[in-house]
Structure formats: structure tokens, C-alpha cells
From Swiss-Prot:
It is found in: Secreted. Residues 505-541 form the CBM1 domain. Residues 469-506 have a biased composition (Low complexity). This is Probable 1,4-beta-D-glucan cellobiohydrolase B. The active site is at E235, E240.
Length: 541
């Protein structure tokens, strides 16, 4: 008789065969070659080092065909019922193919610049794209942003109403889910593992299995549909924008990392109960137009969308360390060498120019929005995701659900534009229909470039145009080392700051106590003093 150990070994072997037969497969027709994209990490001294990164297109955009041939598993917005009668069989029968980035998806890179075209006509018409920054060819780059700032340049001059060039972070797995879900044989190399705070149900594959069961083709999107399952995780929207409007928005979840949901319990855009899931689909947004300043962002405005914009986002903590609790998300812009603080909210009762718990509570109350932000953890919940590490997403898309009116027009459309929170941009409420923008704005595109990450105040420089009690001079020097082909940019900042008095009613140790746009306390509790780090951030030390 065979021993118990022999039976155990045979069972393990059988399990491995079953796992392979039911796995999400990889195609062999076209090699996957990731476009190169450089970016920089900076230090508190202002020295930035170039990193040779790459980008990968999301699995949802890829050709899915049978493993042994060239028959489509998915055509238009429907699955082949023979190849894909259920989730497991479909994953076994179908493979994700390598990508032709420029020819099929309209994605091109040059140095530190990434251009995404809106419509690309190849053998089929491609609409938009979603890409992820990679650590290497099989791993996404994970960013931990507490007590850090994230900076990039963007050109939105060719993004009209109805389009969204989005830069954001999501709590995907670094390997695309391969370790957690052995059925996933494609992994980050092929752009798998996507999730966000909408718990999207339009994904063709989740956790290594197809999402064919319960699939319903979209009524107004020839390329999409929804299945029984969704993929949830925390989301930090750094930049959702076109040439008319922009917003930045944290979206916490009960669990920061990726989890699969089922049916309407997913919540979000794809479910009948928007707030029925474990994530915050609305978030707490800062849109300058929605907050009352209608001349701050747009063509020819303070932040002029006819020209390239440098966007700076800072993630401040309560104690000024990476182990602290997220307390504030600040925004600056730089154009033509001038630093522009984010606009102030002009609504009575909703003050400030950054995202804080107080701002979010006041905004939700005034606008009458359902406060699921607090329900799912608020700033602390968002901070938990930032601490664990998140993947950078760079995308361009149109909106088959609400025509992007939530970003750039009046929304909801059945309320007067004078109602607080309804007016979000100057686009007409008839704008943004995907069939119109895809036909009339097919040549639209967005360019992202010059991505930098580092400690607060390390990734940008520029003049303030006056209004500061301190003088700041910034110079940059770029050198190239031939042996390593690494470019280093060094920024030296000289500041003169008057001492701040202490007070028992001042800011606590490590807290912010000054900077352009700061409206909080400017003194510190004894024995600490307010020490200037740069024109935009002073800290009690």
C-alpha cells in the first residue's frame, strides 16, 4: 500500500496540475516590452537622482484570445460563450497578449515624458489607456507617501470638456496579485491586479479568474460591461483634470489593500447601491471651481491650462514623520518659475486651501453630500493606505456613466448651479457625451512628465512673487555621471527667517506652524520654535 506521504505528494502534484489548468494565461504571439520612463527621487537637501523606470498598460485593454490560437475570448463587450462558459474555464482557455504600445494604444514615452493619446485607430479603435509605473519588468513601483511630496508636470491644453487625464495612487499588489492568487500567471508584467475605490466590476479578470459570470454588456459603451465581481482598494486621486477643471481627492476603504467584492455589495459607480460597499466612492475633493473660485484654473487663468503645469501634492502628518497620522494634504502649482498656492475655499463655513478632517466635515455638511468619507476611515484611513504603499496610475479616459459632469460642469444636473457644491466647472451640462468626444475630440491627448518624489519641500522650486516675511533663493544644477548614466539635479535653498515666539496656545511639537497659504497657528508650545523648512512649510521643532 502507498504510504500517507506518497498520497500527500500525489495530491500536491494533482493540485498543481489543477491550478495550472485553471489559471489566467499569458499569450505568446507578441513579446511584452515595457516603454521606458525615467523619474526622480529627491532628498531633503534638494538633490534628486534619476530612476530608470518603465510603464505597463492595464490588462483590461489587452487582446484576450484562446491559448492555442487566435480566436477572441472577448469581442466588443461580450465574451465567447464556448471559450468562457464560467470564470474558471475562461481563465484556463484564455490568454492576455503582449502590447503594441504606440500602434494600438497611442502610448509613447521619451525620457521622463509620457504621452497618452485619446483615440488610436489600428485594426480596432482604442479609447484611452491606463498605465502603471514599474519597479522592474514584473513588479509595480510601490510609493509610501506619508511626510513626502509628489510632483509632476502635466500638459492638459489638449483635453477638452468630458475628458479626464488622471494621475492617482491605488493599493494594488506589487506583483499584480500573483503571490496571493496563484491562478494569476500574468501578474504585473501584463498589468493585472487593478482595484480602486469604485470597486470596478468592468474588469475582465480579478484574482486570476475571469469575470464572465453575470456579465452584462454596457448599453452605451461598445467595449465594456459589468460582471458579478468587483475589485476594491483605497485610492488617492492626485490629479483628475482637463483644461477646464481639476480636483484632488482621497478615497479611503475599510481595508486599504485589494479585495474582491460581489454584486451590489461592491457599491460605487457599477452598483445600484452606491454606498453599499467597503470603500468611499465619493471621497473628499478639492476642486477650486466647486469651492467658489471660478477664475483660478483654466485657459488664461491664475493656473493657465494653455501651458505646462507643475503640480505639487504634500502629505503632512501630525508629528512630521513618516510614521505619523495623515493630517493634511496640501497643493501647490508652479508655472513660469512662480509658485502658486492652491486657491482658498470661498464658501462661508468651509475655509482653507487644503484637505483636512475639518475641511471635509464642513464641506460635506454645506454641500449636503453623504459623508461616507468619515464612515470608511477619513484621513486616518487614507493615511493607512499611504503608509502601506500604493501603485502610481497614469491614465486618460471618458465617462460613460455621467459624462464627466461631476468634474467640469453642474452635477447633479437636476439642481440649480447656485446650490453649494453643484457647480464644478464651466462646461455645459450637454457636454461630455462619449460618443461626441470620441468623434469630435479624437486627437485629444495628455502629457505627463518630470515625476519627482521626496521629503516636503525637496521636489520643486520657484519664486513666490512676494508676500513672504522670508527671502528665498533657489538654484538648480544638473550633472551627468557617464559611468552610471544617472542624472542628479541639486537645488540649494537659502532662507532667512525671523524667530517665532512660543505660546502655550501654539502648535504642538512636529506640527505645521507657517508657510504660504497656512491659516493655522504660527507659534509653538514651549520649548519648541517655528522653524522654516521652505516658503510653504514651517514646523515646530
Amino acid at each position: 500500500m502507498p504510504s500517507t506521504y506518497d498520497i500527500y505528494k500525489k495530491l500536491l502534484l494533482l493540485a498543481s496540475f489543477l491550478s495550472a489548468s485553471q489559471a489566467q494565461q499569458v499569450g505568446t504571439s507578441k513579446a511584452e516590452v515595457h516603454p521606458s520612463l525615467t523619474w526622480q527621487t529627491c532628498t531633503s537637501g534638494g538633490s534628486c537622482t534619476t530612476v530608470n523606470g518603465k510603464v505597463v498598460v492595464d490588462a483590461n485593454w489587452r487582446w484576450v484570445h484562446n491559448v492555442d490560437g487566435y480566436n477572441n475570448c472577448y469581442t466588443g463587450n461580450t465574451w465567447d460563450t464556448t471559450l468562457c462558459p464560467d470564470d474558471e474555464t475562461c481563465a484556463s482557455n484564455c490568454a492576455l497578449e503582449g502590447a503594441d504600445y504606440s500602434g494600438t494604444y497611442g502610448v509613447t514615452t521619451s525620457g521622463n515624458s509620457l504621452r497618452l493619446n485619446f483615440v488610436t485607430q489600428a485594426s480596432q479603435k482604442n479609447i484611452g489607456s491606463r498605465l502603471y509605473l514599474m519597479e522592474d519588468d514584473s513588479t509595480y513601483k510601490m510609493f509610501k507617501l506619508l511626510n513626502q511630496e509628489f510632483t509632476f508636470d502635466v500638459d492638459v491644453s489638449n483635453l477638452p470638456c468630458g475628458l479626464n487625464g488622471a494621475v492617482y495612487f491605488v493599493s494594488m499588489d506589487a506583483d499584480g496579485g500573483m503571490a496571493k492568487y496563484p491562478a494569476n500567471k500574468a501578474g504585473a508584467k501584463y498589468g493585472t491586479g487593478y482595484c480602486d475605490s469604485q470597486c470596478p466590476r468592468d474588469l475582465k479578470f480579478i484574482n486570476g479568474m475571469a469575470n464572465v459570470e453575470g456579465w452584462e454588456p454596457s448599453a452605451n459603451d461598445a467595449n465594456a460591461g459589468t460582471g458579478n465581481h468587483g475589485s476594491c482598494c483605497a485610492e488617492m486621486d492626485i490629479w483628475e483634470a482637463n483644461s477646464i477643471s481639476t480636483a484632488y481627492t482621497p478615497h479611503p476603504c475599510d481595508t486599504p489593500g485589494q479585495v474582491m467584492c460581489t454584486g451590489d455589495s461592491c457599491g460605487g459607480t457599477y452598483s445600484s447601491d452606491r454606498y453599499g460597499g467597503t470603500c468611499d466612492p465619493d471621497g473628499c475633493d478639492f476642486n477650486s471651481y466647486r469651492q467658489g473660485n471660478k477664475t483660478f484654473y483654466g485657459p488664461g487663468m491664475t493656473v493657465d491650462t494653455k501651458s505646462k503645469i507643475t503640480v505639487v501634492t504634500q502629505f503632512l502628518t501630525n508629528d512630521g514623520t513618516a510614521s505619523g497620522t495623515l493630517s493634511e494634504i496640501k497643493r501647490f502649482y508652479v508655472q513660469n518659475g512662480k509658485v502658486i498656492p492652491n486657491s482658498e475655499s470661498t464658501w462661508s463655513g468651509v475655509s482653507g486651501n487644503s484637505i483636512t478632517t475639518a475641511y471635509c466635515n464642513a464641506q460635506k455638511t454645506l454641500f449636503g453630500d453623504t459623508d461616507v468619507f468619515t464612515k470608511h476611515g477619513g484621513m486616518e484611513g487614507m493615511g493607512a493606505a499611504l503608509a502601506e504603499g500604493m501603485v502610481l496610475v497614469l491614465s486618460l479616459w471618458d465617462d460613460h456613466n455621467s459624462n464627466m459632469l461631476w468634474l467640469d460642469s453642474n452635477y447633479p444636473t437636476d439642481k440649480p448651479s447656485t446650490t453649494p457644491g453643484v457647480a464644478r466647472g464651466s462646461c455645459d451640462i450637454s457636454s461630455g457625451d462619449p460618443k461626441d468626444v470620441e468623434a469630435n475630440d479624437a486627437n485629444a491627448y495628455v502629457v505627463y512628465s518630470n515625476i519627482k518624489v521626496g521629503p516636503i519641500g525637496s521636489t520643486f522650486s520657484g519664486s513666490t512673487g512676494g508676500g513672504s516675511s522670508s527671502s528665498t533663493t533657489a538654484t538648480s544644477k544638473t550633472t551627468t555621471t557617464s559611468a552610471t548614466k544617472t542624472t542628479t539635479t541639486t537645488t540649494k535653498t537659502t532662507t532667512t527667517t525671523s524667530a517665532s515666539s512660543t505660546s502655550t496656545g501654539g502648535a504642538q511639537h512636529w506640527a505645521q506652524c507657517g508657510g504660504i497659504g497656512w491659516t493655522g497657528p504660527t507659534t509653538c508650545v514651549a520649548p519648541y520654535t517655528c522653524q522654516k523648512q521652505n516658503d510653504y512649510y514651517s514646523q515646530c521643532l
